[in-house]
Regions:
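Short glycine/serine- and small hydrophobic-enriched flexible loop segments
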Residues: 149-156, 240-247, 398-401
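Active-site metal-coordination/substrate-binding segment of hydrolases
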Residues: 67-161, 189, 391
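A non-catalytic alpha/beta surface segment that caps or lines the substrate-entry region
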Residues: 22-69, 73-75, 79, 89-90
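Active-site-adjacent substrate-binding region
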Residues: 236-253, 260-264, 309, 319-368
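Zn-dependent metallopeptidase/amidohydrolase metal-coordination segment
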Residues: 269-271, 345-403
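Short helix-loop-beta-strand segments that form the rim/entrance of peptidase-like active sites
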Residues: 153-175, 256
Length: 405
């Protein structure tokens, strides 16, 4: 099975995670994919492949040499983002891309265009795997899963020496729970890489510091005909509070190392309203300052309308793994060398998000992030060059061989 064939099979399994669920995994359908991965691993000779009670898949590629070297791991996640539909994915492979518009859905007039996504120009001459414009593709992160499994197949069928390699596939990464029940001790790796990045060549060991904020607004309803000087409209107060935050510090206006406040959801009526935000920044001090801005905005609303009008709940989600990777920069240097060995130019970029590896790094498993080749994650215009998946499969195998030298 080629990596592309494997990927197309994996995306046929709907695995959208659900933040409202309290189970692990959050959706039962992730277990169906987990069982499929165990079957594939067993078929290639990974004898200890199994799925645990929480839906995590583990397995081992045994060492084929006697040299004493650290145990390395490769990790990807099985779920797809709830931000876009993830069922009935109709993936197809295009002809080698010519640089123009790609018709995703002729009936609905949906196009994938370099005018909107100029990075498409980097894939001229390559076959692209695309959607029909009505669902996401699931390259985040089933491309990573497929690439790891196909690399494992290469390692198992080659006589080139490598050490013990641990594989893991996690549920619920997209809703921030991928590392919640990860068995770091049982996994048994000294170091690992997640394969959950974007375009070919991306190599990441810096991620956002992340927090979530929920603000509950308590209003005061009274008949609008006699409300003068008495009504407190919670929906309007919510809008007022949002206006106290920096208008140009949202995802739309920011890139690279610039952090943001992102209003994820809002609902409101006269008596009650609720705002939900995520707060992000690479710099820890700026991250703490952003949370303080949120606290100050709520305090100002309380000053205007009375104590208890704005009730803020802040929760840290994960932190920048840079401080945990810095003592292990050989992981980055070896990844760069492996990329160059397969003709890929490494591009170190900050992750404008998080990975399972970010949290695992703080649990004693240093875990930078490697590219999958995918683009436009979490949406209907997601795509991945098939040729890049093949390159990344070879890159992963080369990295494991290299680490045994």
């Amino acid at each position: 099975m080629t990596v592309v064939e494997r990927f197309l099979k994996l995306v046929s399994y709907p695995t959208t995670s659900d933040e409202a669920s309290e189970t692990c995994p959050s959706t039962a359908r992730q277990l169906a994919l987990a069982q499929e991965l165990v079957r594939q691993m067993q078929d290639m000779g990974i004898a200890d492949a199994h799925v645990d009670q929480d839906g995590y898949v583990y397995g081992t590629v045994p060492a084929n040499c006697d040299k004493k070297i650290p145990v390395y791991g490769l990790i990807a996640h099985m779920d797809t983002s709830p931000d876009a539909p993830g069922e009935n994915i109709r993936a197809r492979i295009t002809e080698p891309y010519d640089g123009g518009d790609i018709v995703l859905n002729e009936e609905k007039h949906i196009m994938l265009s370099p005018k909107e996504y100029p990075q498409l120009k980097n894939s001229v001459g390559k076959r692209l795997i695309v959607t029909d414009g009505t669902t996401l593709l699931g390259a985040d992160d089933k491309a990573g899963v497929a690439e790891i499994l196909s690399a494992a197949q290469l390692l198992l069928t080659s006589e080139k020496p490598h050490g013990t390699i641990k594989l893991a596939f996690t549920p619920d990464e997209e809703i921030g729970r991928g590392a919640d029940r990860f068995d770091v001790k049982g996994f048994g790796a000294d170091y690992a890489y997640t394969v959950d990045g974007g375009a070919l060549g991306e190599l990441e060991y810096e991620n956002f510091n992340a927090a979530s904020a929920k603000i509950e607004i308590c209003g005061k309803s009274i008949h609008p005909g006699s409300a003068k000087g008495q009504m407190v409209n919670a929906a309007l107060v919510a809008m007022e509070l949002h206006g106290l935050l920096p208008a140009l510090e949202t995802p739309y206006y920011t890139e690279k190392y610039k952090g943001f406040y992102h209003l994820v959801a809002m609902r409101g009526e006269t008596e009650q309203a609720e705002l939900q935000y995520i707060i992000r920044d690479h710099d820890r001090a700026k991250f703490e300052a952003r949370k303080a801005v949120m606290e100050k905005a709520c305090a100002e609303i309380d000053r205007r309308y009375g104590a208890g009008t704005a009730v803020l709940t802040l929760r840290d989600s994960y932190y920048n793994m840079k401080e945990k990777i810095a003592p292990c920069m050989f992981l980055i240097e070896n990844a760069k060398k492996a990329m160059e060995s397969v003709g890929v130019t490494p591009k170190i970029v900050p992750i404008r998000g998080g990975t399972d590896g970010a949290r695992l790094s703080f649990e004693g498993l240093p875990c930078p992030n490697l590219c999958t080749g995918g683009e436009n994650f979490h949406g209907r215009f997601e795509y991945i060059p098939a040729d890049d998946m093949e390159t990344i499969t070879n890159l992963l195998a080369q990295l494991m061989w290299q680490l045994a030298e």
